[in-house]
Amino acid sequence: MKSIKELYRIGTGPSSSHTMGPRKAAEMFLERHPDAASFKVTLYGSLAATGKGHMTDVAIIDTLHPTAPVEIVWQPKVFLPFHPNGMTFAALDSNDKVQENWTVYSIGGGALAENNDNPTIESPDVYDMENMTEILQWCEDTGKSYWEYVKECEEEDIWDYLAEVWATMKDAIHRGLEAEGVLPGPLNLRRKASTYYIRATGYKQSLQSRGLVFSYALAVSEENASGGKIVTAPTCGSCGVMPAVLYHLQNSRDFRDMRILRALATAGLFGNIVKFNASISGAEVGCQGEVGVACAMASAAANQLFGGSPAQIEYAAEMGLEHHLGMTCDPVCGLVQIPCIERNAYAAARALDANLYSAFTDGMHRVSFDKVVQVMKQTGHDLPSLYKETSEGGLAKDYKQM
């Protein structure tokens, strides 16, 4: 299992799988062919179906075009067997002869993969345990918590990296709360974060608390939709959940930054378990793998901050994911706006509820986090492609008919 640095990726929106991943792939291909006369890039499946809305072509062209002309070919009806987000890069010489064809897949969260023989294009594994049942047992045997397991496995600079992650998350909230106007794209969707923030301050504490959480999640998600700088947690489409929960708890409970970083480490571990054993790609398993996993991560982080035991933390995360099972990924017009932005706000509130629910228990429950991850994976594979980031079904289809 990889470092949580590869889960928390700092970059620009609107999509980790459709923008960040293709941009990274283009950069890698350019390094191999800096003298190419031209490039041809074929996008398949979900990448082609919603690539325009996610600015996939823009990310690739911005990277390659300064070197040579780029042709983009769209194949939304062709799904390569390894993953729905496939793309083939071709480098051509001055005689239009192909120098190399390279097929690569954007598998979610900004990560890339080539095929079953070379599944990941990343750094080596750093975790020796790959499911939460084993890690929970380790916590019980050693008396340590999840973040301490992260500390044992990661390099020493992990805390510096998480500090940068936290700073980026807070900056996105601050920018989003100040920004006004309309988000990019044909929906002409107005930003709401600043309005929610102002209105929330006028309520008494109980309602104010929930309104502020909404405003923070909206702020980050709207920044992402505008192509702003955010952190995948675990994806761009779900990037508002974790910052909203952690920022709210730090402001309301005065948690020091180091405790927030430990909560980020714990949340990252849970997100990593899902990424390794299932998927965090909306094109592969639907929105349950994005917003659902973000809710699980935020639930675990919140429960740790409030002193939860390893069993209670695992229970909070399990509920955060379980109650998003079956959630479809059906972005209207292929944009990370409707229903994505509102879902971030709701998931942040759900994470706080999962934390509270777990806090009232001793952590004992029937359905384990690992089991829910397995069910999420199977549910995602059972979902038709209509509901997995193709904008051909669900809300996206109904919106076209309105």
Where are these regions (language model features)?
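Conserved phosphate/anionic-ligand binding catalytic regions in large, soluble enzymes, centered on
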Residues: 8-26, 226-245, 287-295
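Short beta-alpha connecting loops at secondary-structure transitions
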Residues: 10-11, 281-286, 331-340
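Alpha-helical support elements that line or immediately flank enzyme active sites
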Residues: 19-32, 243-254, 299-307
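Early transmembrane hairpin of solute transport permeases
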Residues: 22-91, 104
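C-terminal regulatory domains involved in ligand/effector binding and gene-expression control
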Residues: 69-203, 211-212
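Accessory "access/gating" subregions that flank catalytic or transport cores
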Residues: 170-254, 258-282, 286, 394-402
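Functionally critical mobile loop/hinge segments
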Residues: 302-402
